[in-house]
Amino acid sequence: MNQSFYDKLTSVIAKERVYVDEPMSRHTTFRVGGPADFFVTPKAKEEVRDVIRICKEAGMPYYIIGNGSNLLVSDAGYRGVIVQIYKEMNEVKVEGDLVKAQAGALLSGIAAKALGAELSGFEFASGIPGTIGGACMMNAGAYGGEMKDVLESVTVLTGKGKIIELGRNELELGYRTSVIAKKGYIVLGAALKLERGDGEKIKTYMDELKEKRVTKQPLEYPSAGSTFKRPEGYFAGKLIEDAGLRGFQVGGAQVSEKHCGFVINRDHATAADIMELMRQVQIRVKENSGVDLEPEVKRLGDE
């Protein structure tokens, strides 16, 4: 262990929230991934800022995660610092028609809070398995809704260590992208502008979406969510199915039989199994339909 670097980290964040050689399989929804050299869980935006400053000063690589959805960490793990903005930074509060959330708040929890306040517009996100930090960065969406429809502002940490607020017109939100992703900003919090609605109708709609997910998505197995981005004019799952890959397996990883757009950890898969399966899917889909599938899942660590 790099003791001097550990000492620097623990000068800005409590020791009980600094972990050494932490298995990433505990922190990703795929349930795979080797150890991160350091794993920290800040509980305030100032702690995030200070940890990043220390990493930069030491030339230490770092990576920000939320609840570990949409992420594939290699079996070798990560040589650097994983900064998890999740349970220690997940406060949500309602102010009129605004819902303000820290970056680690789960989308499902924010949707529940909005429902409790009879605010409509965020139902689409109630089943997306991620935090609002990641959702802002990639303009997450489902069932016809996207973050860009409801985001009022986002508080970020810039590359120069400044904490600033970006208004909706500054966010440059597109399909699975934003100015946050383009500039490498770190999301610290967000404000959503919603509309007054009927609590019963909001709940009914959320229940309908939940039923769709349970019926159509392989929620009973670990996965990272949708594995590939939607190619323009196509659906990734349909292209994968048309290539004859429903149920296709490499080691413990499998193309879900329930929904071909999902790669699942069927049986003690390794990250290498999942990566090879994704590679094979890309090759077969390209051969069958001529379409290049681009991963939606982020890869991290040495292969």
Model regions: which residues?
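Anion-binding (especially nucleotide phosphate/pyrophosphate-binding) glycine-rich loop
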Residues: 2-132
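Conserved active-site and cofactor/substrate-binding residues in soluble primary-metabolism enzymes
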Residues: 4, 25, 43-46, 105, ...
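Alpha-helical scaffold segments in soluble metabolic enzymes
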Residues: 8, 50, 109-113, 153, ...
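Phosphate/pyrophosphate- and phosphate-bearing ligand-binding catalytic cores of soluble enzymes
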Residues: 19-20, 71, 157-276, 283-284, ...
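Structural signature of FAD isoalloxazine-binding scaffolds in flavoprotein oxidoreductases
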Residues: 33-34, 40-45, 72-90, 137-168, ...
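Short, solvent-exposed amphipathic alpha-helical segments in soluble enzyme
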Residues: 55-57, 245, 280
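Short, basic and Ser/Thr-rich N-terminal targeting/leader segments
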Residues: 58, 65-67, 150, 221-222, ...
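Short Pro/Gly-enriched beta-strand edge/turn motifs at strand-loop
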Residues: 135-138, 173
